[in-house]
């Protein structure tokens, strides 16, 4: 259409909402007029038109993104499409965003600037919120009982709903545990060990709702695991394992007793004596998440599935969870 807009015409008919939210959101437009270069002194051009050139640009941009000391002065990050642009940044993650004078969209900034302050944990953030030292924050699930106190401090408290679910992805590429995860009955048994109702009520203070699958509950509604194909039922989990050749050792580690691919055997790729012991990578800094995984570890141990919980910062979590890494869950 012009130098800032283009059209996409599909050869088939698609649901517009699905196409926009599930396909177009995977396209990330990048400012070639400012970023299509391979060094600070290089002038933007069309190097991105070739695979080799695109890789060189990506390498340069990646290196610049890791240079946190010069983040707020690097001209690369001054190029923005939204109502705000980076004003100040410190290596610990504190960032000040200022209104962009060149933004001509409908949703222009209504404030001149705002500062995003990082915290080491949700408890640390909540302590600052209690003191009234910040304008906007959140109440962690484990602190919901203090809502009235926060309101007396002058804050307005509203639910932070999201159309989302929480799940634990399996690393099927892991050479040790991948063949185990590939067995459907293993995944079924593990789901039978998750007490969604109890976790929702006790750990998340009803800020999270049980669900039966990948489609999230409507925000604000009380979900239930009743009617789910894989309800909380440790007895079913134990039976599934025993029926497939595992020596279930409660509060120990369950091992494969009958290796093989036949009926009553552990399954393809699972060796005799293989253990149901896995490392779970979890995001650090969230008390309720820590408590949830402690509950899962306890529940899974009832049928001899050992979970070693390893908490890491968010950025490390994303890196470790890549399919080629050795993470298990």
Identify the meaning behind each predicted range.
Residues 17-32, 81, 169, 179-182, ...:
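A structural "hinge/loop" feature
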Residues 8, 82-85, 95-96, 112-117, ...:
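Short, well-ordered beta-strand elements
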Residues 72-75, 101-147, 285, 297-298, ...:
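Ligand-site clamp/hinge motif
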Residues 318-329:
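Single conserved hydrophobic/aromatic residue that forms the stacking wall/gate
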Residues 146-159, 325:
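Ligand-binding "clamshell"
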Residues 96-101, 182-298:
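Append "and occasionally in soluble cytosolic enzymes with long acidic Gly/Pro-rich linkers
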Residues 1-62:
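Surface-exposed binding/hinge segments that line
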Residues 156-172:
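Periplasmic-binding protein-like
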């Amino acid at each position: 259409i012009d130098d800032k807009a283009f059209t996409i015409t599909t050869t088939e008919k698609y649901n517009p909402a699905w196409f926009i939210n599930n396909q177009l959101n995977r396209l990330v437009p990048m400012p070639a007029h400012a970023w299509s270069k391979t060094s600070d002194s290089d002038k933007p051009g069309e190097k991105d038109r070739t695979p080799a050139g695109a890789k060189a640009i990506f390498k340069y941009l990646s290196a610049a993104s890791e240079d946190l000391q010069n983040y707020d002065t690097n001209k690369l990050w001054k190029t923005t499409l939204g109502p705000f642009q980076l004003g100040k940044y410190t290596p610990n993650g504190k960032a000040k965003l200022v209104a962009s004078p060149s933004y001509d969209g409908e949703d222009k900034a209504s404030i001149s600037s705002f500062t995003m302050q990082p915290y080491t944990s949700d408890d640390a953030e909540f302590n600052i919120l209690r003191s009234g030292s910040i304008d906007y924050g959140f109440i962690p699930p484990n602190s919901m009982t203090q809502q009235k106190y926060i309101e007396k401090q002058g804050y307005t408290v509203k639910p932070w709903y999201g159309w989302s679910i929480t799940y634990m992805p399996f690393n099927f590429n892991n050479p040790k545990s991948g063949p185990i995860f590939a067995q459907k009955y293993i995944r079924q048994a593990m789901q039978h060990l998750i007490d969604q109702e109890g976790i929702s009520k006790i750990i998340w203070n009803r800020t999270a709702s049980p669900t039966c699958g990948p489609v999230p509950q409507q925000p604000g509604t009380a979900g239930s695991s009743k009617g789910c194909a894989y309800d909380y039922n440790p007895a079913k989990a134990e039976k599934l394992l025993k029926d497939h050749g595992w020596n279930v050792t409660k509060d120990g580690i369950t091992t494969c007793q009958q290796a093989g691919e036949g009926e009553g055997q552990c399954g393809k790729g699972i060796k005799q004596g293989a253990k149901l012991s896995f490392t779970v990578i979890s995001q650090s800094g969230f008390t309720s998440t820590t408590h949830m995984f402690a509950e899962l570890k306890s529940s899974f141990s009832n049928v001899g599935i050992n979970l070693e919980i390893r908490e890491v910062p968010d950025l490390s979590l994303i890196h470790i969870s890549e399919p080629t890494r050795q993470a298990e869950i």
